[in-house]
Amino acid sequence: MAKYIMAFDQGTTSSRAIIFDRSGKIIASLNQEFKQIYPKAGWVEHDPMEIWGTQIGVAKGVIEKAGINPEDIAAIGITNQRETTVVWDKNTGKPIYNAIVWQCRRTAPICDELKNKGFDKKIREKTGLVVDAYFSGTKIKWILDNVEGAREKAEKGELLFGNIDTWLIWNLTRGKVHVTDYSNASRTMIFNIHELKWDKEILAELNIPEQMLPEVKPSSYVYGYTDKSIFGVEIPIAGDAGDQQAALFGQACFKPGMAKNTYGTGCFMLMNTGEKAVPSNTGLLTTIAWGIDGKVEYALEGSIFIAGAAIQWLRDELRIIDNSPQSEEYAMKVEDTNGVYVVPAFVGLGAPYWDMYARGTIVGLTRGAKREHIIRATLESIAYQTRDVLEAMQEDSGIRLQALKVDGGASANNFLMQFQSDILGVPVDRPQVIETTALGASYLAGLAVGFWNSREEIEKNWNVDKHFEPAMDNEKREKLYKGWKKAVERAMKWAEE
């Protein structure tokens, strides 16, 4: 009887493999970084062969590290950096170009063209996304337009496209299976999230042949089996979801209105909206959360560009702290920020403002302002930005948030989590296992093979490490938030010519 599930967590900077047991505990984990390629300013690439090599290397290594046999693994679940695009030759299995990474801005001119034609409104309606170089559609077009002979080969059916999940599954099955899941497909900008199929009109506009696209399947499903030559046995590949959606699943956000926030360099916030695709009027993305149990569920997504990165700025540029955990210690030394607000709009502001010309600001300074006040105000800015996004989510969905589940590096900061709860006026829950992305992929795989029987069973695995209850009265909460809104106004449009 197989006792474990293995997750592949293929991220932007590293490939990781984690082995989980039935209670969702980590048995072993292994991680390997790979090369970031920057051919020109604003361009970012990865070598798909290196991604495959590092991912299979950590998978074999983690089995050894855990001291188990490949036969002990019931299934593999895959989660991945979203939007990153690979095009390869069907016959040789070799990529015709490096993977174009989600961060890469090279296709901005193609996006501008779509906007100038007014085609962006159509894309927004059909895919739930804004037209941006971030998503896969324009990256595929760029490869077909710029790699010699690519378009002819694609039209003859000799080329295949995939995001990283598709590329890994194709290699694990030695080319037998060309597939993706609903959550990853919903980030390509060419998938109709209402009709649940590749959109012929968008494909025609971008001149992408449909035969190069993978089949789209549920997120919890046996797609195929690993080729025997890889692990010595055939293991079912049974779960697939983009990283942020996998984290939503790993956090057991199964009901409409449940939300999670991942506090990393930036923040990614997703709210489950159930079987209803909620269009956003506030600059959020409408996306597929997952496809499971014969239906698709949707989410609203908002991203904050600068969160944990603001704490790094205090450490590396201002040098007023020596390490990130120290920020909590200093923030606790003062009762408040003494009227100081920091707006960390270092690269503009994301949802719900979408102001590329906003710049970082410190306001409310007086002669009594100390280092502690600036540090505390920087931490508080992460919580204020989270409230901005959540207010937008509540406005779009009409659903009131009951509690916020948190994960990611900065969720370890107790001061920040308590202030987050205070400023939202809702409880904040930090789980014991914060590797929620890999956990979500494991759950999806385990459900498909009967390792777990239901979402209810999974929910029982979700345990709170720390629960934060709001301790601030409403009058104070609203007064502080009003001050934040004023500070944001001062930061907006600053860099406009």
From Swiss-Prot:
Xref: InterPro entries: ATPase_NBD (IPR043129), Carb_kinase_FGGY (IPR000577), Carb_kinase_FGGY_CS (IPR018483), FGGY_C (IPR018485), FGGY_N (IPR018484), Glycerol_kin (IPR005999)
EC number: 2.7.1.30
Annotated positions binding glycerol: R82, E83, Y134, D243, Q244
Residue ranges the record marks as coiled coil: none
UniProt cross-references to PANTHER family, sorted A to Z: GLYCEROL KINASE, SUGAR KINASE
Described function: Key enzyme in the regulation of glycerol uptake and metabolism. Catalyzes the phosphorylation of glycerol to yield sn-glycerol 3-phosphate.
Pathway(s) where this gene product acts: Polyol metabolism; glycerol degradation via glycerol kinase pathway; sn-glycerol 3-phosphate from glycerol: step 1/1
Binding, sn-glycerol 3-phosphate: T12, R82, E83, Y134, D243
GO biological process: glycerol catabolic process; glycerol metabolic process; glycerol-3-phosphate metabolic process
Positions with a binding annotation for ATP: T12, T13, S14, T265, G308, Q312, G409
One Pfam family linked to the record: FGGY_N
Reaction(s) the record says it catalyses: glycerol + ATP = sn-glycerol 3-phosphate + ADP + H(+)
Family: Belongs to the FGGY kinase family.
Protein name (record): Glycerol kinase
One Gene Ontology term of the molecular function aspect: glycerol kinase activity
Keywords noted in UniProt: ATP-binding, Glycerol metabolism, Kinase, Nucleotide-binding, Transferase
Subunit (UniProt): Homotetramer and homodimer (in equilibrium).
Annotated control of activity: Activated by phosphorylation and inhibited by fructose 1,6-bisphosphate (FBP).
Gene3D superfamilies: 3.30.420.40
Amino acids binding ADP: T12, R16, T265, G308, G409, N413
Annotated HAMAP family: Glycerol_kin (MF_00186)
Any one GO CC term of the record: cytosol
